[in-house]
């Protein structure tokens, strides 16, 4: 994997930094594992904007990823690594011994030809998936379930991982990248290793148009608006003279946004500042 800084042949190329991975498959994706992906433009079924700054962008096919890893005790071989436009991580196409193919998240260190397996008796090896009850304390894992059988929900983006720091009764304690420590049922399944493509954070888009390709529209500052459009709007200067708020008047600096009190008891320590 190489980090390439583009030559300043134009204003739009001057600051571009690309991540080039020669190991990625250059052909088309595996068609049976593709699905349609329709654009919403940030609108709901009423046609009202529910998420701002979304619209346009290149068309994409959704890749059906196996987050559950529920094909147990059947070895699989990595056929190829692929780019996925729907996530920051790369994905791997694996061929199971019974002939079925699936996409999985590509962990760091996984190469074409490697053998992986899911199941309670799988060895502790990068890419293998098994219940956290059977994973040694101190191990680094990704694609971690919050509920048994629901599929991985934690640590799925590029470079993400979680560390198992304790096992007590029916629960294991995890340390997340944010610094949060939380308990999860030991029967939940996780995959050994960390997600690959950790250099993703080093890329620089270099121009506004690159964000438009991704379907992200411009974000206008509230202080640049009129009073009718935003609480920060209006006035003769740039100072809006109040605590920062959203367009709907809700505090925006440090206000807690978590509402699921039912699972608060599983959080041992809140994330660090």
Curated annotation (Swiss-Prot):
<keyword id="KW-0699">rRNA-binding</keyword>
<dbReference type="GO" id="GO:0016740">
    <property type="term" value="F:transferase activity"/>
</dbReference>
<dbReference type="GO" id="GO:0002181">
    <property type="term" value="P:cytoplasmic translation"/>
</dbReference>
<dbReference type="Pfam" id="PF03947">
    <property type="entry name" value="Ribosomal_L2_C"/>
</dbReference>
<dbReference type="InterPro" id="IPR014726">
    <property type="entry name" value="Ribosomal_uL2_dom3"/>
</dbReference>
<comment type="subunit">
    <text>Part of the 50S ribosomal subunit. Forms a bridge to the 30S subunit in the 70S ribosome.</text>
</comment>
<dbReference type="InterPro" id="IPR008991">
    <property type="entry name" value="Translation_prot_SH3-like_sf"/>
</dbReference>
<keyword id="KW-0689">Ribosomal protein</keyword>
<dbReference type="InterPro" id="IPR022666">
    <property type="entry name" value="Ribosomal_uL2_RNA-bd_dom"/>
</dbReference>
<keyword id="KW-0687">Ribonucleoprotein</keyword>
<dbReference type="InterPro" id="IPR012340">
    <property type="entry name" value="NA-bd_OB-fold"/>
</dbReference>
<comment type="similarity">
    <text>Belongs to the universal ribosomal protein uL2 family.</text>
</comment>
<dbReference type="GO" id="GO:0003735">
    <property type="term" value="F:structural constituent of ribosome"/>
</dbReference>
<keyword id="KW-0694">RNA-binding</keyword>
<dbReference type="InterPro" id="IPR022669">
    <property type="entry name" value="Ribosomal_uL2_C"/>
</dbReference>
<feature type="region of interest" description="Disordered">
    <location>
        <begin position="221"/>
        <end position="262"/>
    </location>
</feature>
<dbReference type="Pfam" id="PF00181">
    <property type="entry name" value="Ribosomal_L2"/>
</dbReference>
<dbReference type="InterPro" id="IPR005880">
    <property type="entry name" value="Ribosomal_uL2_bac/org-type"/>
</dbReference>
<dbReference type="GO" id="GO:0022625">
    <property type="term" value="C:cytosolic large ribosomal subunit"/>
</dbReference>
<dbReference type="InterPro" id="IPR014722">
    <property type="entry name" value="Rib_uL2_dom2"/>
</dbReference>
<dbReference type="InterPro" id="IPR002171">
    <property type="entry name" value="Ribosomal_uL2"/>
</dbReference>
<feature type="compositionally biased region" description="Basic residues">
    <location>
        <begin position="253"/>
        <end position="262"/>
    </location>
</feature>
<dbReference type="GO" id="GO:0019843">
    <property type="term" value="F:rRNA binding"/>
</dbReference>
<dbReference type="InterPro" id="IPR022671">
    <property type="entry name" value="Ribosomal_uL2_CS"/>
</dbReference>
<dbReference type="GO" id="GO:0003723">
    <property type="term" value="F:RNA binding"/>
</dbReference>
<protein>
    <recommendedName>
        <fullName>Large ribosomal subunit protein uL2</fullName>
    </recommendedName>
</protein>
<comment type="function">
    <text>One of the primary rRNA binding proteins. Required for association of the 30S and 50S subunits to form the 70S ribosome, for tRNA binding and peptide bond formation. It has been suggested to have peptidyltransferase activity; this is somewhat controversial. Makes several contacts with the 16S rRNA in the 70S ribosome.</text>
</comment>
């Amino acid at each position: 994997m190489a980090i390439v800084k583009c030559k300043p042949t134009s204003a739009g190329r001057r600051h571009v930094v690309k991540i080039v991975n020669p190991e990625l498959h250059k052909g088309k994706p595996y068609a049976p594992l593709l699905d349609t992906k329709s654009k919403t433009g940030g609108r709901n079924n009423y046609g009202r904007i529910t998420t701002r700054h979304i619209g346009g962008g290149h068309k994409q096919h959704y890749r059906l990823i196996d987050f559950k890893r529920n094909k147990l005790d059947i070895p699989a071989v990595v056929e190829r690594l692929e780019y996925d436009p729907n996530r920051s991580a790369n994905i791997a196409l694996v061929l199971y011994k019974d002939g079925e193919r699936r996409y999985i998240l590509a962990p760091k260190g996984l190469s074409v030809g490697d053998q992986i397996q899911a199941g309670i008796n799988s060895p502790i090896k990068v890419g293998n998936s098994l219940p956290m009850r059977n994973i040694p304390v101190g191990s680094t894992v990704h694609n971690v379930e919050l509920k048994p059988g629901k599929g991985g929900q934690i640590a799925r983006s590029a470079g993400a991982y979680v560390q198992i720091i304790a096992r007590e009764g029916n629960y294991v304690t995890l340390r997340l990248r944010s610094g949060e420590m939380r308990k999860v049922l030991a029967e939940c399944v996780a995959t050994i290793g960390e997600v690959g493509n950790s250099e993703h954070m080093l890329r620089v888009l270099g121009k506004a148009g690159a964000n438009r390709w991704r379907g992200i529209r411009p974000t206008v500052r509230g202080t640049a608006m009129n009073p009718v459009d935003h609480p920060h709007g209006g006035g003769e200067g740039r100072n809006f003279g109040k605590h920062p708020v959203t367009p709907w008047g809700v505090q925006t600096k440090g206000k807690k946004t978590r509402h699921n009190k039912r699972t608060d008891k599983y959080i041992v320590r809140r994330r660090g500042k």
